[in-house]
Amino acid sequence: MVRKVDKTKLLTVIGIIIFLFGGAVRIFSHLTSSADNYMENFDVIIFSGLIIGWGVSVSYRIVQKNIRICLVISAALMLLWMTLRAIKYNSPADINTYGRYLWYSYYIAMVFLPLMMFFAMLNIGKPENTNNRKYLLIIPAAVLVLLVMTNDFHQLAFVFEPDFHNWNKQYSYGPVYYVIVVWIFILVLSSIVLSINQCRISATRKKLWIPIVIILVAIIYTVWNNLNHGYSGLRIYNVPEVFCFASIALWESLIQIGLVPSNTGYGN
């Protein structure tokens, strides 16, 4: 069992190194003025590989089926997000409507990832088909995504200049955007509260600071990045990368401290 736990920790360290390497690639391309699509594509491949590796890993490690499904869906959503981002940045700059809808599509992952986390937390230690009413939350999630995808018709999520002039730089946020922010905040906060309440082992409870720190670091970096436009005009990590890596790191921390049942080290 010790060897299995060590192997899991080793894979976690490798994942962190891959994430840092992705940031280093972007810094290198910025310093050498080679910020072209080739470097950006290489970055996407790095992060996509990390997501795929994690998704395959949890499909084998997670014992409880309903939690495993939530995590695999989460990995699929992250991969979708990275794929959409790659398509958007490999498209011509003047694609306008096409590029805008690719951007809107990011919110599929942003809305559903916190929901998958909430579902998984509710499922910890519960038999299958318990409290299926929680899945009704898929309805408001789908409505939020639909409102974003149809934003061109009502501009309740993003407000643009007339005729969508310079849409990717000149826009403001509408009420739907703020509803999504609140949606994400409530689901993440609820997931944390559930994790604390469901943590009955004192040793595990003492380690709950780890996932909380991960969430705080992700929030602080995102706010700082948006307010200061990165470091010297460079955003080392974009929102999709931070969001996805924070989700993976959060889940791994919950698995490692023993809150989420897995077949590596759980019950030690």
Model features per residue range: what roles?
Residues T32-S48, L146-L194, N226, Y231-Y237:
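Extracellular-loop-to-transmembrane junctions of the mid-late helices
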Residues R3-I17, I124-D152, K207-V213:
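The cytoplasmic-loop to transmembrane-helix boundary for the fourth helix
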Residues I16-S33, M78-K88, M149-N151, T222:
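Alpha-helical transmembrane segments of multi-pass membrane proteins
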